[in-house]
């Protein structure tokens, strides 16, 4: 198979069925995902949430109904079941010190979901589990020593000299941080294969609604539980099927915005605060951030609509503002909107669900698909995480 090289990037030959990855660049080799068994259709959310929390406040019901419609979410999954509420009724008692109970549930649940997602990913990858040299584990939903990275490694049967990295409490941008860290590991350790796993549950923040905590209702209407996994490595072998190349990664925070998104762990669980100006702050800074990433593609004529977009769907308002600010064509954020509809905002996991949809979309387009794209996520800080991605998929 012949190929030419322009701007440091390998190009397809006319007979190729996949773009060739650049030597030494990290590539995505397989994906997996997992969810708890409890499915929550959005149309049933209000009735179930108010019943479980023993709330009969008409104002709260009306507010939650409105939020459920505006989120665009249709389906979510949750660890929380009636059996759990029967065992721990104090979870629905205002002011009850329940952090111990919440962690008993969460610590086990996130590892089990991570295990299922990882097994699916490894199966798609097709190589022995012993070939995994590094594991990066991302979660904002568990607290213990040792962490979920060790428990997951043991359950998967990874070698006891596997190199482990645990990323705690990053929030919604954690999945892209994990990709950035895994990219650095893969590119600086020749022959390495990195398993990145993210796993999240909302059990730490579940509580009865209170008018003094309006964000709790946003969380009830928007967030879900689940896990995701991806194998990352440079210089793929013939037995591997790379579909995206992580060409460049960057993180930055917006000075003076650390109070816009806050989470504080208390005896009652984790209390969140979300500023109403979050979408505006993202809108005001997104264009410069994206141009910084695009500049690394080596094509100064490239415009926003010349690329594919994998954006963490923090909520419809963020997607709408980004779309308007960058003058994106409607279909550019379709994978992000689809992930939001199907799973809700699942914190760090969600970007990997978006990338799975994007992989399918690029494959369907074949030679007509864009070669370059951006992966973006936003979270506490306000922190921006970004990836310049190169699609390796063609017809």
UniProtKB/Swiss-Prot annotation:
Acyltransferase as UniProt keyword: yes
Pathway(s) this gene product operates in, as recorded in its UniProt entry: Secondary metabolite biosynthesis; flavonoid biosynthesis
UniProt superkingdom: Eukaryota
UniProt enzyme class: transferase
Active site per database record: 172
Organs and tissues of expression: Expressed in flowers and flower buds (at protein level), and, at very low levels, in roots, seedlings, leaves and stems. Mostly confined to anther tapetal cells.
pH relationship of activity: Optimum pH is 7 (at 30 degrees Celsius).
Annotated function: Plant type III polyketide synthases (PKSs) that catalyzes the condensation of malonyl-CoA units with various CoA ester starter molecules to generate a diverse array of natural products including long-chain alkyl alpha-pyrones. Accepts up to C(20) chain-length fatty acyl CoAs as starter substrates, and carries out sequential condensations with malonyl-CoA to produce triketide and tetraketide alpha-pyrones, potential sporopollenin precursors. Favorite substrates for are midchain- and v-hydroxylated fatty acyl-CoAs (e.g. 12-hydroxyoctadecanoyl-CoA and 16-hydroxyhexadecanoyl-CoA).
Protein name, as recorded: Type III polyketide synthase A
Organism listed in the record: Arabidopsis thaliana
Taxonomic lineage from the root: Eukaryota, Viridiplantae, Streptophyta, Embryophyta, Tracheophyta
Gene name for this UniProt entry: PKSA
């Amino acid at each position: 198979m012949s190929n030419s090289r322009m701007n440091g990037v390998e190009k397809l030959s006319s007979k190729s069925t996949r773009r060739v990855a650049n030597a030494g660049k990290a590539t995505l080799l397989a994906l997996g995902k997992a969810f708890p068994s409890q499915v929550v259709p959005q149309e049933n959310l209000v009735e179930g949430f108010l019943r479980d929390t023993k709330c009969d406040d008409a104002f709260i019901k009306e507010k939650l109904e409105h939020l459920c419609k505006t989120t665009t979410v249709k389906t979510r999954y949750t660890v929380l079941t009636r059996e759990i509420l029967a065992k721990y009724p104090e979870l629905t008692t205002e002011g009850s010190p329940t952090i111990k109970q919440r962690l008993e549930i969460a610590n086990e649940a996130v590892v089990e979901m991570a295990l299922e997602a990882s097994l699916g990913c490894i199966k798609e990858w097709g190589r022995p589990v012993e070939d995994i040299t590094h594991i990066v584990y991302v979660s904002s939903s568990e607290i213990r020593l040792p962490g979920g990275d060790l428990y997951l490694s043991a359950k998967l049967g990874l070698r006891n000299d596997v190199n482990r990295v645990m990323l705690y409490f990053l929030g919604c941008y954690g999945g892209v941080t994990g990709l950035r860290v895994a990219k650095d590991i893969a590119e600086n350790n020749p022959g390495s294969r990195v398993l990145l796993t993210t796993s999240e549950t909302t059990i730490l923040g579940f509580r009865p609604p209170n008018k003094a905590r309006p964000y709790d209702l946003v969380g009830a209407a928007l967030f879900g539980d689940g896990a995701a996994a991806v194998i990352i490595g440079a210089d793929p072998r013939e037995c591997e099927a790379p579909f995206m190349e992580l060409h460049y990664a960057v993180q930055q925070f917006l000075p003076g915005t650390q109070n816009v998104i806050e989470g504080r762990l208390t005896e009652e669980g984790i209390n969140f605060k979300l500023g109403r100006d979050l979408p505006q702050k993202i809108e005001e800074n997104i264009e410069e951030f994206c141009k910084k990433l695009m500049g690394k593609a080596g094509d100064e004529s490239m415009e926003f609509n010349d690329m594919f977009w994998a954006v963490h769907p923090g909520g419809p308002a963020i997607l709408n503002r980004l779309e308007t600010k960058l003058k994106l064509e409607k279909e550019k954020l379709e994978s992000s909107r689809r992930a939001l509809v199907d799973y809700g905002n699942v914190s760090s996991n969600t970007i990997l669900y978006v990338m799975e949809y994007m992989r399918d979309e690029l494959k369907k387009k074949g030679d007509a698909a864009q070669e370059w794209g951006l992966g973006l996520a936003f979270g506490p800080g306000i922190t921006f995480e970004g990836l310049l991605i190169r699609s390796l998929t063609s017809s």
